[in-house]
């Protein structure tokens, strides 16, 4: 497992100067040609998402005003807080901020022919489903994972197994992204 704190992660500025990215993890680790990747992006201006042919992207708005996502003839979608939205990353998608507010979102990308991600918001203790990878990001509250305490803007990335996250306060929210491998594929084939 890899623990992270968003406030301590390195920041990569976008070439178009419209935002920045904090990479959480990739699988396989440290590979440019990843099967899946999780990141957090801060968007400061209207602009286009980077293209990633053969990938699916799931975007979840964490902070800021709603964001309008437009893709030519394919869709117009208003991204609302904590409501994941999936689209293929090989199409031009423009992001327009509402009311000029900066926004922050969680992104998970998966190779369409290898694995699939599912993103959910949890508000109570839960156990992961024995997936072969995933990411948890704490939106608020205090959560226990084994002997590790996770609080706002912290999280963990794992590559296999079942894990129980216990909510330690009356209220809390976390984003949970689970990776499931398609038939004929396994993370064991990669490592």
Swiss-Prot record:
It holds the Pfam family HutD. Belongs to the Ves family. PANTHER family: PROTEIN VES (PTHR37943:SF1). This is Protein Ves.
């Amino acid at each position: 497992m890899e623990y992270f704190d968003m406030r301590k992660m390195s920041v990569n500025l976008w070439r178009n100067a419209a935002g920045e990215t904090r990479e959480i993890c990739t699988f396989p680790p440290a590979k440019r040609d990843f099967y899946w990747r999780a990141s957090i992006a801060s968007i400061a201006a209207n602009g286009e998402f980077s293209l990633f042919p053969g990938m699916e992207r799931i975007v979840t708005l964490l902070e800021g005003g709603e964001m309008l996502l437009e893709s030519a003839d394919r869709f117009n979608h208003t991204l609302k807080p904590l409501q994941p939205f999936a689209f293929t990353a090989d199409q031009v998608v423009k992001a327009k901020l509402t009311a000029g507010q900066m926004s922050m979102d969680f992104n998970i990308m998966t190779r369409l022919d290898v694995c699939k991600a599912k993103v959910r918001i949890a508000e109570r203790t839960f156990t992961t489903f024995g997936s072969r990878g995933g990411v948890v990001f704490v939106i608020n509250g205090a959560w226990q994972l084994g002997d590790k305490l996770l609080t706002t803007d912290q999280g963990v990335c794992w590559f296999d197994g079942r894990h129980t996250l216990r909510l330690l306060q009356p209220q809390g929210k976390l984003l949970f992204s689970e990776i499931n491998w398609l038939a004929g594929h396994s993370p064991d084939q990669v490592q």
